Design a protein with these regions (language model features):
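A conserved ligand/cofactor-binding region detector
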Residues: 1-243
């Protein structure tokens, strides 16, 4: 990987109301594996010796930075990936500790994606299963869909995130490869079901090909989930018909 970051967990107990139940809210802070690079320092780059520490900690310093500039967009994408990857890898850690086969991941865990901010969970879970655990693609896809659910809170365009392809490929090249593969398989099913309807194929694609090419995160979340809903019955119907 181009950059390695440590995810440091912080747990807060959440007490139930008038019962003996307490759940755990786990939040994450980003840190660099090494706080000081002596090799860079000894080459005379004194500020560069702490660059990795600063850039790593910036990931969780300020949530949702201004994304008008490309630097803000990049930091937002890093934040979303950090949350998703740290949480999913933590689930695999628990799975291993309890000696549960990876094929039963979906029996132990359910991940709820509220809006598109955590939608990278689809391709990151596939990466962890296929690349790290060597699970066959079809089995990994079944586990992924059974593990994930998506709630859409609004259909306003600004809430349906689309990441520029150039930025996505620079920061998450392997994940983009996985998205391409998911998209190819999904669109093949669409073409079979809706013969002679290229407009529908283009609308449902995970990649927006009009203008500046971009990854449609809402489409990715829908395709990778076993359950999709809105915040009300009417909203759920709009998600079904419009999204």
């Amino acid at each position: 990987p181009h950059k390695e970051v440590l995810g440091i967990p912080y747990d807060t107990p959440i007490l139930g109301y008038l019962n003996n139940t307490a759940n755990t809210l786990r939040l994450w802070r980003a840190e660099a594996p090494e706080s000081f690079d002596f090799g860079v320092f000894n080459r005379g780059d004194y500020y560069g010796a702490v660059d990795h520490k600063i850039s790593s900690e910036n990931i969780t310093k300020v949530l949702y930075p201004n994304d008008e500039a490309i630097e803000g967009k990049a930091l937002r994408l890093e934040q979303q990936f950090f949350l998703v990857s740290a949480s999913l890898q933590d689930m695999f850690r628990i799975l291993d500790r309890q000696n549960i086969p990876v094929e039963r991941f979906h029996e132990k865990f359910a991940a709820q994606m509220n809006d598109t901010h955590p939608a990278l969970a689809v391709c990151e879970l596939m990466r962890l299963l296929v690349d790290e655990r060597h699970v066959p693609w079809d089995t990994a896809w079944e586990i992924t869909q059974k593990s994930l659910a998506y709630t859409n809170h609004t259909l306003l365009p600004e809430a349906l995130e689309q990441w520029p392809l150039a930025l996505f490929s620079r920061l998450l090249p392997r994940h983009l490869e996985i998205i391409y593969e998911i998209n190819d398989r999904f669109l093949e099913q669409v073409r079979v079901r809706y013969l002679g309807d290229p407009e529908r194929v283009g609308r449902l694609s995970l990649i927006n090909e009009s203008g500046h090419r971009a990854v449609r995160m809402a489409n990715l979340a829908c395709v990778g989930s076993h359950a999709i809903n809105g915040v009300a019955a009417m909203h759920s119907e709009l998600v079904r018909t419009d999204l």
